[in-house]
């Protein structure tokens, strides 16, 4: 039987591995998308839907829906992380610009560290 959670936040936290410390990633231990992002299934307004765990967490912390052009950038570089301190809601362009900058730095031999 499926567990009933008091809130979506409680469900998200219950489905992460215990973080090593206060700054560590909250790594999703449920289903992963083929690109490494955490996924969960839910019924909203009577309809079954699949959602990304990091997007749900960002919306909970922002107390609003993400705008259509907005996405949470993983500052920790861990796609399975849902720690709200590691998620920065930015536009798609900013997220891609950051990705390109990290890739260029890595090609030059720099060790890319999380922001």
Which stretches of residues belong to each language-model region?
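Conserved recognition-core residues within compact binding domains
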Residues: 1-72, 77-115
């Amino acid at each position: 039987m499926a567990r009933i959670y008091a809130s979506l936040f409680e469900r998200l936290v219950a489905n992460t591995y215990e973080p090593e410390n206060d700054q560590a990633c909250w790594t999703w231990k449920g289903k992963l998308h083929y690109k490494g992002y955490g996924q969960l299934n839910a019924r909203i307004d009577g309809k079954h839907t699949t959602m990304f765990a990091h997007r749900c967490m960002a919306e909970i912390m922002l107390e609003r829906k993400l705008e259509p052009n907005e996405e949470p950038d993983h500052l920790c570089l861990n796609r399975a992380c849902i720690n709200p301190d590691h998620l920065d809601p930015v536009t798609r362009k900013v997220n891609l610009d950051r990705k390109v900058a990290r890739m260029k730095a890595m090609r030059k031999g720099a060790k890319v560290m999380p922001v």
